[in-house]
Amino acid sequence: MKLYMSVDMEGISGLPDDTFVDSGKRNYERGRLIMTEEANYCIAEAFNSGCTEVLVNDSHSKMNNLMVEKLHPEADLISGDVKPFSMVEGLDDTFRGALFLGYHARASTPGVMSHSMIFGVRHFYINDRPVGELGLNAYVAGYYDVPVLMVAGDDRAAKEAEELIPNVTTAAVKQTISRSAVKCLSPAKAGRLLTEKTAFALQNKDKVKPLTPPDRPVLSIEFANYGQAEWANLMPGTEIKTGTTTVQFQAKDMLEAYQAMLVMTELAMRTSFC
């Protein structure tokens, strides 16, 4: 059995704020070590539970955070930030399941460091359904008929996953106090929880169905200001919804919608003031 792991950072236990997840800030090296250790707990249990291959995709920021020299020796790692499918790079229909580790809640909702890709996004929608990174990534997995078996992160990410994916296993390694304060498990306790939940998720795999994306989905992105919407609207095929900061794109399938999101958010970041 092949298992796919997408590993973000904001949902890792013990990381309360951006000083742990920004490579230019003081706690980053501590954060990436804990991130690597959490990934290893899940990888080790995946192999113990019968997986024959585990592919890990570093899915945070520049996507070169996981310490390959400390990673489980049997895992394969995708690292680096120029990826056609970003947080779900390398995922295809050869995988039996996916695991999302270190995930956080979507923008405009409570949760530790909650956001959706960039600071300027208020909401993502697929058709009329609000989604965050978790939802978009789960839809791409569903496009390949791959179920998301487990989501680990803060309590709000776990709740978001449970509302989105029936029977998904969740592992809440920290509880939200505010967007930059948490009650967290120690690394050892988090490791035990992740080990137990990974084992259960793999045992439970036949009860979880893929999150099937709609045919020809409409991607809508609500930005924080009109300047960001104007930049995103430079992508061919988009339009700004009248009287809003929402940019829409009619996609031929979920893969095109996902890549449109990547381009639109990249363009929106060119806005120099709010």
From Swiss-Prot:
GO BP terms, alphabetized: proteolysis; sporulation resulting in formation of a cellular spore
Enzyme class, first EC level, given as a word: hydrolase
Active site feature: 115
Recorded effect of pH on activity: Optimum pH is 9-11.
Subunit note: Homodecamer. A 20 Angstroms wide channel runs through the complex, giving access to a central chamber holding the active sites.
Organism for this UniProt entry: Bacillus subtilis (strain 168)
Cofactor list: Zn(2+)
Known EC number: 3.4.11.-
Sites where the protein binds Zn(2+) 2: 8, 60, 104, 133
Annotated positions binding Zn(2+) 1: 8, 10
Family: Belongs to the peptidase M55 family.
Record's keyword annotation contains ATP-binding: no
Cofactor, how bound (note): Binds 2 Zn(2+) ions per subunit.
Entry protein name: D-aminopeptidase
Induction: Nutrient deficiency conditions, which also induce sporulation.
GO molecular function annotation: aminopeptidase activity; metal ion binding; metallopeptidase activity
Keyword Protease part of the UniProt annotation: yes
Domain of life the protein comes from: Bacteria
Alphabetically ordered keywords of this record: Aminopeptidase, Hydrolase, Metal-binding, Metalloprotease, Protease, Sporulation, Zinc
UniProt xrefs under InterPro entries: DppA, DppA_N, Peptidase_M55, Peptidase_M55_sf
The protein's role, per its UniProt record: Hydrolyzes N-terminal residues in D-amino acid containing peptides. Among the tested substrates, the highest activities are with D-Ala-D-Ala and D-Ala-Gly-Gly. The physiological role is not clear.
